[in-house]
């Protein structure tokens, strides 16, 4: 079991119960899933770019990504409905906890000119979204084998009802939020 999951069960649940006055531990917010999304708009002209992006995503997450397709045709972007234009991975359970641990402890500190994560990037329901500009911050990516630096979106879905609860949950995991 991941260290972060043990820490959640032993310390975070008690801490949040006291802070928000929950009556049962089932009311305490928890992380339900982490979604990684990588849009590869250039894949229209070169299919190899999407394969490389999917390989990077698989290395980062430890799971085979789902290829996302365009929902509708857009003439301005020269895409048609059904064209493969990106990939995504949904992490739950043990893989989710391991990824979160690597994200907080290893990857986020490797971001260039890092001054903390935006504490206002919550969606109103306690879910947190962040963007990463370079996939090379993850230790699983070999810098020499990268064909192109790509960014990805990371969404952390929680069972929190408010942004305040979600922020307290992530802050309990020592997320480096900007002051």
Swiss-Prot record:
Organism of this sequence: Aeromonas hydrophila subsp. hydrophila (strain ATCC 7966 / DSM 30187 / BCRC 13018 / CCUG 14551 / JCM 1027 / KCTC 2358 / NCIMB 9240 / NCTC 8049)
SUPFAM superfamilies under this entry? RL5-like (SSF55282)
Note the Pfam families from the entry.
Ribosomal_L5, Ribosomal_L5_C
What keywords appear on the UniProt entry? Ribonucleoprotein, Ribosomal protein, RNA-binding, rRNA-binding, tRNA-binding
Q: Which residues form the signal peptide?
A: none
- Which PANTHER family does this UniProt record tie to the protein? 60S RIBOSOMAL PROTEIN L11-RELATED (PTHR11994)
Outline the subunit composition: Part of the 50S ribosomal subunit; part of the 5S rRNA/L5/L18/L25 subcomplex. Contacts the 5S rRNA and the P site tRNA. Forms a bridge to the 30S subunit in the 70S ribosome.
MF term (GO), any: rRNA binding
Family from the record = Belongs to the universal ribosomal protein uL5 family.
- One GO CC term on file: ribosome
- HAMAP family documented for this protein: Ribosomal_uL5_B
Any one Gene Ontology BP term = translation
**Protein name per its UniProtKB record:** Large ribosomal subunit protein uL5
The answer to keyword Ribonucleoprotein applying to this record is yes
Q: Which InterPro entries match?
A: Ribosomal_uL5 (IPR002132), Ribosomal_uL5_bac-type (IPR020930), Ribosomal_uL5_C (IPR031309), Ribosomal_uL5_CS (IPR020929), Ribosomal_uL5_dom_sf (IPR022803), Ribosomal_uL5_N (IPR031310)
- What's the stated role of this polypeptide? This is one of the proteins that bind and probably mediate the attachment of the 5S RNA into the large ribosomal subunit, where it forms part of the central protuberance. In the 70S ribosome it contacts protein S13 of the 30S subunit (bridge B1b), connecting the 2 subunits; this bridge is implicated in subunit movement. Contacts the P site tRNA; the 5S rRNA and some of its associated proteins might help stabilize positioning of ribosome-bound tRNAs.
Keyword 4Fe-4S in the entry? The reply is: no
């Amino acid at each position: 079991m991941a260290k972060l999951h043990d820490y959640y069960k032993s310390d975070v649940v008690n801490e949040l119960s006291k802070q928000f006055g929950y009556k049962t531990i089932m009311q305490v917010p928890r992380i339900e899933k982490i979604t990684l999304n990588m849009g590869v708009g250039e894949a229209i002209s070169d299919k190899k770019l999407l394969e490389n992006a999917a390989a990077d995503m698989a290395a980062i997450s430890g799971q085979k990504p789902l290829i996302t397709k365009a929902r509708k045709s857009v003439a301005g972007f020269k895409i048609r409905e059904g064209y493969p234009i990106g990939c995504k991975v949904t992490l739950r359970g043990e893989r989710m906890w391991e990824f979160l641990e690597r994200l907080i402890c290893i990857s986020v500190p490797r971001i260039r000119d890092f001054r903390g994560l935006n504490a206002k990037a919550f969606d109103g329901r306690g879910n947190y979204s962040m963007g990463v500009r370079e996939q090379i911050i993850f230790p699983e990516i070999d810098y020499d084998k990268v064909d192109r630096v790509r960014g990805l979106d990371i969404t952390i879905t929680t069972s929190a009802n408010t942004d305040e609860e979600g922020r307290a949950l992530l802050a309990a995991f020592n997320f480096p939020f900007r002051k």
